[in-house]
Design a protein with these regions (language model features):
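Ligand-binding loop in jelly-roll beta-barrel domains
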Residues: 91, 105-130
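Short acidic-glycine-tyrosine-enriched beta hairpin
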Residues: 58, 88-105
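Short histidine-centered beta-strand/loop micro-motifs
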Residues: 64-69, 86, 111-113
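Glycine- and acidic-residue-biased ligand/ion/polar-headgroup-sensing regions
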Residues: 70-88, 98
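A short beta-loop-beta micro-motif enriched in histidine and acidic residues
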Residues: 45, 49, 61-74
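A short, N-terminal "cap"/entry segment at the start of jelly-roll beta-barrel domains
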Residues: 2-55, 101, 133-137
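Extracytoplasmic
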Residues: 51-53, 69-72, 105, 118
């Protein structure tokens, strides 16, 4: 692992800790089944590319429909038990502290199989000026 990778991983871990510490006072029954909170967005030194970080919260039983992104997605699970169905990789169950990589333009879905809220920190390295999420038809 090079120094750049180490810095990025350290930054991701720090942001994950910060995101996990942020609670919500809204009762669970009033929350959206899947909600996204954009944390940061930055241009990269690679022309036409940008990085985004988003916290995604899943209520018990909630599913994010099959979709893809115009770049890579790196997932850090903050809490709960989530099952990802990724084209070409099958189903993968992950829990708090686990990481997962979704290749660019790969359709996937995720569902919260736990009895409590599940949350992830999603880091995207994507093509700029393209929709972040494209639903499967």
């Amino acid at each position: 692992m090079n120094i750049g990778s180490t810095i990025v991983m350290g930054a991701c871990a720090g942001l994950a800790t910060l995101a996990a510490a942020c609670g919500s006072s809204t009762p669970v029954s009033e929350r959206e089944p899947v909600s996204r909170t954009d944390l940061q967005r930055h241009d990269l030194s690679i022309p036409g590319r940008e990085a985004l970080q988003t916290r995604v919260d899943f209520q018990p039983g909630a599913t994010a429909a099959r979709h893809k992104h115009p770049g890579e997605e790196i997932i850090y699970v903050l809490k709960g038990t989530l099952v990802y169905d990724i084209d070409g990789q099958g189903s993968q169950s992950v829990t708090a502290g686990d990481v997962l990589f979704v290749p660019a333009e790969t359709f996937h879905s995720v569902r919260n199989v736990g009895d409590d809220e599940g949350s992830e920190l999603a880091t995207y390295v994507v093509d700029k000026d393209k929709p972040l999420l494209v639903l499967a038809k």
